[in-house]
Amino acid sequence: MPRSSIVSRIAHDSYRHSPSTMPSGRWWENLDCNFCDRPEGFELEPWDWARVNATAAVDQVMKAWGGTLLAGTLPVGFLPSFTRDAYTDTPEDWQVYTDLVAEGSDPLRFFRPPPDDTRVTHYDPNWGFFRPDAGRCLGLKFESPYVPFNERLAPTFRNYRNNSIARARYWCHDKGPRPTLVAIHGFMADPYWINERFFSLKQFYDRGYDVVLATLPHHGLRAERSSYYSGQGFFTAGISGINEHMGQAICDLRVLLGWLRRERGVDKIAVTGVSLGGWTSALLASIDEDLEAVIPNVPVVSPVDLLLEWQPAGGIVRAGLFALRWSVRKLREIVAVTTPLTYQPKLPSERLMIIGGVGDRLAPPKHSRLLWDHWGRCRIHWFPGNHVVHLDRGEYIAQMESFLDQLDFRYVEAGEQDLAEAG
């Protein structure tokens, strides 16, 4: 592995020669059952140690709060049921997904291509903190064409009114088409005004990119009126629902990417995402080979192991496993169909980059490390912050810019391009 693949000071020496954490074969069976309890192996200087532990303490509080919210949601759809309740799983439902991963690792068997004729409309949004001087800010929406792979969930999805309309925010220059950066928010973190700043979208826009913020299923305006919080619907249809909602997220994003290519003439698209969005963007790397780059930020790669760490929700999951006499491996197998570790990326490692937080306790760095090993130890940057407070964020934004520049992900005026070709 070239030394330059780790582009941050933290963990540079301690990780460079360390053995891979990614097991061979079926990862859901061969990954340590106690992966969620595995310590983080960082060697930190005193100043970094202080910052990491301070931010990690904040994450522990947020994790308890998030775990409490999920604990009120999980019993509805996660407790095993042998009835045909629309909001509970059955063994037959689980078999649908385990059969898929048993038969091979082709992601397109579950993530089926969306139709090409989905109509995307745009409108002027009522508000937005970033209004470009030279360009437009547009709201995008379209009817999600997603049909659940598990046919039993089709009536449930048809009953979702708000979630059936996919949405995004699009900042585009007057002159185009431009290289476009698509950003995907995290769980419960959908407000555009937050993500405009978090992803430094103005900075990327000023570099000549067009930028898009996509809204995940059951978040923001896609949340149903009955939801207590944004993102709740992602978990109210059981384990099957998580798989299908991730399937819908990928489907809607592929519609959006197709629209950018066909209708806007965009030929260079990079995708980044944080947390749940990092999980989603990592999956896209295994599905869309035409992407220029994928940059997951504090990604989740084994949601079952993550959930076991979020108390009290993790206790509910452990109780369910005990009642079924299952190990965590069985639960991993059910969600493996929507996990990036199950598939090989279609992009070469030179077009992949991971950003991980050393003090992150909501999506711990062991997840970023596992994906890094799975992706052949591509470029990675470690920052000394938690899930929300990304200390030294300016450093990894600069690394992202440098990474994209190396891929020639830039806008060149027509006259400049002619001169370059003539030279």
Residue ranges and their predicted role:
Residues 1-153, 160, 207, 417-423:
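N-terminal targeting or regulatory segments adjacent to alpha/beta-hydrolase or S9 domains
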Residues 160-165, 172-180, 206:
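Proline/glycine-enriched tight loop/beta-turn segments at coil->beta junctions
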Residues 182-247:
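Cap/lid segment of the alpha/beta-hydrolase catalytic domain
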Residues 263-275:
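Alpha/beta-hydrolase fold nucleophile elbow
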Residues 280-329, 382:
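Hydrolase active-site cap/lid region
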Residues 347-348, 353-356, 360:
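Short beta-strand/loop motif that positions the catalytic acidic residue
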Residues 361-367, 392:
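Conserved alpha/beta-hydrolase "acid-adjacent" motif
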Residues 385-398:
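Catalytic histidine-centered segment of alpha/beta-hydrolase-like enzymes
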